[in-house]
């Protein structure tokens, strides 16, 4: 029998979970990381003192022996070590592929540029309310392979999947899969919208039912739905039979399935049109997986939303403050501006900026001109945002987020909302988007 040697590519939380999985399965493996100071290195060496670790490069004689590379999604597929392993005949896949090969319980698979975590968490809560033993994992929370120890405890997996994870997954057969929306993101990695969309579309392969956004052509399955695959859609308009949407009656907007009104939107806690879409998607996914409508609607009425995602902070002198630090790309910020601006009388003072990931900030011009009073900019790509939007609304610069909060307070009028929705990644100034949101929230609480 051929001896298999696995290469774990990338340390960090995912890499550690892959190493534990391989050890449980008595597999031989070595570890590689592109960074000299790999995160989790000390913890790894403590747990696996005898496993060879290669930092920054892996010797050719090791690569030539590798049969399988299990890589963290953060590592680009054109990284030289992965290229060398591929040319030497190794199979390359990720932790979600390992999970797919191991489990028999049904999977709900969720991707999209924005709203993934909200929808994944919502569906998980609906499943829990219905009495399912549910694992909520993937691009959210605990790495999936760390949950495999307890696989026999789960009757359902709800997986949030990024485009990077989907690029590395081949065997997943979800009971229902969705792409919520696709707007430009990660183009520094995928290079083109076509490649990014292609990665997202992989989620539909092998799915028994697919849910797509009928207002977003990128989410429509490329393979037209075969007879044995159920196709469901959601959108802002009134839905046809079996699909999901909004119905307005006597000045009240309802979430609806077909002609059936399910719930007035004011009775759900997550606010803004984009969150109504998230709620519809969660309802459709949960129902497709066999969860009763009673449990679905009960959870919708009580779900408070996730931190750093259009999260209400407080009101000061008639001005509302909202933390949308998770708005790390243009699509998320457009959703937040349209969703919040469309449901209020005043204007938005927008705090934005950070690392733009190659995005075109001109796309913000239309919603900004409609709903935004002024913009306060921070971070690495402030110049690019200013040159795209300075002719649309007044733009001010701040050297820190705390400074931006102080400036925004002077720009806002009673009835306005100050919205932190950066349209950028946070790593130029912060540990991550959570850290950025926490700094904003504590600054606002100090006003």
Curated annotation (Swiss-Prot):
ATP binds at residues 112-118. It comes from the Bacteria. Its EC number is 6.3.2.9. Keywords: ATP-binding, Cell cycle, Cell division, Cell shape, Cell wall biogenesis/degradation, Cytoplasm, Ligase, Nucleotide-binding, Peptidoglycan synthesis. GO terms for molecular function: ATP binding; UDP-N-acetylmuramoylalanine-D-glutamate ligase activity. It is an enzyme of class 6 (ligase). Pathway: Cell wall biogenesis; peptidoglycan biosynthesis. Signal peptide: none annotated. InterPro entries: Mur-like_cat_sf, Mur_ligase_C, Mur_ligase_C_dom_sf, Mur_ligase_cen, MurD. Its main location: cytoplasm. It catalyses: UDP-N-acetyl-alpha-D-muramoyl-L-alanine + D-glutamate + ATP = UDP-N-acetyl-alpha-D-muramoyl-L-alanyl-D-glutamate + ADP + phosphate + H(+). GO terms for biological process: cell division; cell wall organization; peptidoglycan biosynthetic process; regulation of cell shape. GO terms for cellular component: cytoplasm. It is found in: Cytoplasm. PANTHER family: UDP-N-ACETYLMURAMOYLALANINE--D-GLUTAMATE LIGASE. Cell wall formation. Catalyzes the addition of glutamate to the nucleotide precursor UDP-N-acetylmuramoyl-L-alanine (UMA). Belongs to the MurCDEF family. This is UDP-N-acetylmuramoylalanine--D-glutamate ligase. It comes from Legionella pneumophila (strain Lens). The lineage of its organism: Bacteria, Pseudomonadati, Pseudomonadota, Gammaproteobacteria, Legionellales.
């Amino acid at each position: 029998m051929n001896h298999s040697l696995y290469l774990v590519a990338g340390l960090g939380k995912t890499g550690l979970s892959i190493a534990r999985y391989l050890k449980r399965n008595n597999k031989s493996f070595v570890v590689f990381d592109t960074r000299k100071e790999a995160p989790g290195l000390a913890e790894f060496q403590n747990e696996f003192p005898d496993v060879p670790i290669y930092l920054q490069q892996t010797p050719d004689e090791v690569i030539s022996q590798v049969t399988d590379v299990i890589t963290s999604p953060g590592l680009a597929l054109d990284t030289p070590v992965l290229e060398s392993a591929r040319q030497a005949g190794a199979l390359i896949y990720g932790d979600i592929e390992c999970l797919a090969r191991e489990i028999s319980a049904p999977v709900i698979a969720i991707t999209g540029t924005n709203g993934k975590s909200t929808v994944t968490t919502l569906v998980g809560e609906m499943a829990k309310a219905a009495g399912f033993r549910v694992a909520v994992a993937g691009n959210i929370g605990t790495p999936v392979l760390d949950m495999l120890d307890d696989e026999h405890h789960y009757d359902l997996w709800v997986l949030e999947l990024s485009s990077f994870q989907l690029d590395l997954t081949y065997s997943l057969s979800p009971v229902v899969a969705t792409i919520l929306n696709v707007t430009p993101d990660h183009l520094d990695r995928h290079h083109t919208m076509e490649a990014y969309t292609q990665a997202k579309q992989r989620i539909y392969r092998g799915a028994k039912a697919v849910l797509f956004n009928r207002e977003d052509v990128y989410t429509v399955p490329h393979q037209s739905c075969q007879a044995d695959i159920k196709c469901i859609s959601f959108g802002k308009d009134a839905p046809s039979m079996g699909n999901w949407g909004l119905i307005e009656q006597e000045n009240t907007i309802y979430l609806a399935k077909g002609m059936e009104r399910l719930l007035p939107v004011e009775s759900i806690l997550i606010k803004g049109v984009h969150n109504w879409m998230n709620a519809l998607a969660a309802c459709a996914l949960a129902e497709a997986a066999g969860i009763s409508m009673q449990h679905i609607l009960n959870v919708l009425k009580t779900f408070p939303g996730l931190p750093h995602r259009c999260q209400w902070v407080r009101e000061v002198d008639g001005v509302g403050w909202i933390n949308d630090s998770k708005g790390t790309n243009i699509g998320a910020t457009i959703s937040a501006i349209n969703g919040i601006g469309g449901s209020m009388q005043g204007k938005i003072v927008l705090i934005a900026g950070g690392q733009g990931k190659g995005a075109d900030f001109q796309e913000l011009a239309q919603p900004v001109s409609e709903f935004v009073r002024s913009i306060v900019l921070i971070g690495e790509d402030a110049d690019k945002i200013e040159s795209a939007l300075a002719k649309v609304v007044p733009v001010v610069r701040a050297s820190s987020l705390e400074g931006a909060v102080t400036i925004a307070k002077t720009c806002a009028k009673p009835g306005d909302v100050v919205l932190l929705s950066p349209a950028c990644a946070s790593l130029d100034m912060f540990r991550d988007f959570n850290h950025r949101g926490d700094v904003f929230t504590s600054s606002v609480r100090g006003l």
